[in-house]
Amino acid sequence: MGTKRSSLKGSLLLLLLMSSLFLFKSVESLPICPSGAVNCQVSLSDLFDRAVMLSHYIHSPSSEMFNEFDERYAQGRGFITKAINSCHTSSLSTPEDKEQAQQIHHEDLLNLILRVLRSWNDPLYHLVTEVRSMQEAPDTILSKAMEIEEQNKRLLEGMEKIVGQVHPGDRENEVYSVWSGLPSLQMADEDTRLFAFYNLLHCLRRDSHKIDNYLKLLKCRLIHDSNC
């Protein structure tokens, strides 16, 4: 009986992993413009549809990856109390909830999303390389980290196109929050190193959730005239 349950559990986990990968590939297969197209112009509505989809598929595996790491490496270590307010993006003034976000002009909110996404380029790259070097790191964590890194680049590209349509010719300087956590990810001390991973994944989950909410709010405001 125990063998059957283990087999069923393994099959369900494999199914969930394959479903997650399928959703990522579905998003990845949606080109911004057809191959070889010249002067392609995608509607703002379509760009927002794609951005909202991408942000959702970044936040979902970010949460799963954090939960898996927490369960496997962080139990009993008291990491959560140390992780509060220690994200590298804390220097960016981000609204904490929908009510605060609604008070911000759409141009400022768009630029804020760009800054947060740019702030994750470097840490996501190093997250992938350092997870590869972890002993006994689950393949699911590595595969999610790799997918999130790729989808973050795609979302940033899409957001730049959205800003280009909403405010044509108004190019913002590439402002972002610098991450300096690589030495901590490479520490010999296990507790220090594991907390660095934990904190990075905690912040990724937090920021991906914020971006997901901001994009839904902006889509409602700019595409549906706040009628949603």
Curated annotation (Swiss-Prot):
Annotated localization: Secreted
Function (record text): Prolactin acts primarily on the mammary gland by promoting lactation, mammogenesis, mitogenesis and osmoregulation.
Keyword hit for Signal: yes
Organism: Trichosurus vulpecula
Domain of life of the source: Eukaryota
PROSITE patterns: SOMATOTROPIN_1, SOMATOTROPIN_2
SUPFAM superfamilies per record: 4-helical cytokines (SSF47266)
Pfam families per record: Hormone_1
Quaternary structure (record): Interacts with PRLR.
Disulfide bonds: C33-C40, C87-C203, C220-C228
Protein name: Prolactin
Gene Ontology process terms (BP): female pregnancy; lactation; positive regulation of cell population proliferation; positive regulation of lactation; positive regulation of receptor signaling pathway via JAK-STAT; response to nutrient levels
One MF term in the entry's GO annotations: prolactin receptor binding
Family as reported in the entry's similarity comment: Belongs to the somatotropin/prolactin family.
UniProt-listed InterPro entries: 4_helix_cytokine-like_core, Somatotropin/Prolactin, Somatotropin_CS
A GO CC term assigned to this protein in UniProt: extracellular space
Modified residue annotations for Phosphoserine: S55, S63, S119
Residues spanning the signal sequence: 1-29
